[in-house]
Amino acid sequence: METETEHDRTVSVDDNDSLVPEPSSTKESFFEDLSLTGQVMNPQLSSAGEVLTKVELDFAFVSEKLVNLSLLTMQLGTRENDFESFVSKKEEDEEEPSSNVDDDDDSAEKALEFDLLSSILNSEVKELESLLGFLQNEIQSARVMISPFQHDGEAFLDLEGKLNDTEQSLGQLMEQVVEMKKQSSNFQRLSSGLDEQGSWSGGQTSVSQNDGEFGDLSAKINMQTADQQRNVLRMLEKSLAKEMELEKKLSESRNTERELEMKLYSSEQDVVYMEEVTEDAFSRWLEADNAAEVFKGTSKEMSGKLQILQFNLSGSFKREDNLKSKLVDSKERLEAKECALHKLDSSNARLADFLVAQTEGLKESLQEAEEKLILLNTENSTLSEKVSSLEEQLNEYGIQTEDADATSGALITDLERINEELKDKLAKTEARAEETESKCKILEESKKELQDELGNFRDKGFTIHKLASLEKHLRDSDLQLEHAVAAVEASKEKQNLLYSTVSDMEDVIEDLKSKVLKAENRADITEEKLIMVSESNAEVNEELKFFKGRLKEGEKYLQQAEERKLRTAKDIGVHNKIMKKLVMQLAAERERLHKQITNLSRENCVLMVKLKKVGKTGYMESGNGSEVSPKSDQNASSCHQGSRLQATFISLTNPEEEETGSKSDIGSVRRLDVGALRFKHILVAILVILISSIAYVISQQNM
């Protein structure tokens, strides 16, 4: 029977180990705190929340154990009458010994069962009392932990409400434990009068039982013969061997249960990790979607700007085409004007050469005329002398005078003819001067026209080289005109008409110079404008290149975003498949565990039935009606094992069967099951799969 007491101790230790919550419960409480507050809590507040969740789980365990102990008290209440009848019979037997030994054995067996159950109830009540004291200390420590955070708002209020609820539930549980303790003390008071031999001593020979360690049942059975002792010892050995086998099986089942719990914990961790991965993938997908929308907006803006720039470029291209056409026209006109200028230059050179030749000819003719005048004067003087001599000789010679008159008349006619020739030459020179003046006027007008055309050409954007060549031509023409003016001034010294024409030519040349300067200024302005236009065109071209590059980058980013979308969609699909497989595996694992637990419970029931049958067969084999049967030992051990197995496996049975059983026995009793917590995980996984599939469908529709 020492093995039985050791078995009781192991069961109580396992029950105490079951008080410690699983790691997943703390994580669930932490996520619940996050969902309630909507923000990340302080680590001390979160640790206090974890303590409260542990306390709530321990409260659930205590309430469940109280329900089981209430069932035990009900059984003890039903057996109390049997115990009282046994006590009364013992007292009567002490006064008058009876001959019915079988009834005495049955009553002694029931009394021993009552004693064992009352001691079990007492030990369990003590354990619950110590556990409630520990939980009270935990609640006080949690209150001390959250007391510095009174100004944190909603988190503190939620934890304060949880603390108040736990204190209220603790008070209710303490009241129930006190009532249970009173009942167990009453039962212990009744069973304290039973001595070690199973006889009633009237309360004088009561032996205290320490922490669930009971006396040996073999010492409590009154054995009278050696055959009975041998049979009992054999039965005890068989029962001990079976009990050892059952303990081995139970330890193996516990090991398998722990392994399954570890597997469930690892699967829960995998599920949590997959949930985090799916959340990260979903957040990345949302970020990619937002980035794609931003890129779409920027691409639309860039496309609008590009359309505006293309419109401006088309306008600028049209303007450029117009300017090019105007440039071509102006080039053609300039070439025509250059041809005209070349012709004018050639004509000016010819005129200058002609004027130089004319001036030289005029100078030579004037010199000849002067020489002729000198000769004429000398001839006149000689003639006058001759006339005087002839007059003197006329007197002398009359015939000679007539001859002299004839010769003098001829000379006079010759002189008059020479004068007329000189006058004709002067008229010709005057006509030539007038022609030069008219040509100068024509040149002035042509220069004005050329200056205007040069200004127009410079406004239209001609090159500096052409303008420099034109200026050189103008300077050459100016020099030629100056030479002509110098020649005309030299001729004007002798003729006022030539002086007036030369002065007019100088005025015209000065006007032309001023106009040329103005034209040069205008040409510089037009060149600056052309430079500005070219710079603006270059800037526009650079902006076009930049925007084209930005467009290409935007298209690349859009392609990358679409590729990321496809990748994330594929990843989400793969994760969804993995999650579905995990959920199916979890469901299959849960069903397998449930089936295994039901099979174990059935095997335990079968073993209990077999034990009962073995006890009955042993009693039949004894064949001696006066001897005591080992049925009491087997029934006590089977009842004890059944109660312990019920306490260990009650948290793993089907929640619906437990609810129906508890309602039929006690009423409406609240129960917490591990399956309910697992069902939450399954629902969360299904919701995550639905959300990811909906997001994938929406993304495909948007694409």
UniProtKB/Swiss-Prot annotation:
The chain crosses the membrane at residues 679-699. Residues 92-107 have a biased composition (Acidic residues). It is found in: Nucleus envelope; Nucleus membrane. It comes from the Eukaryota. GO terms for cellular component: nuclear envelope; nuclear membrane. Residues 1-27, 86-107, 189-208 are annotated as: Disordered. Signal peptide: none annotated. Keywords: Coiled coil, Membrane, Nucleus, Transmembrane, Transmembrane helix. Residues 198-208 have a biased composition (Polar residues). It is a single-pass membrane protein. Its main location: nucleus. Residues 1-12 have a biased composition (Basic and acidic residues). Residues 118-183, 236-265, 318-461, 500-604 form a coiled coil. Together with WIT2, required for the nuclear envelope docking of RANGAP proteins in root tips. This is WPP domain-interacting tail-anchored protein 1.
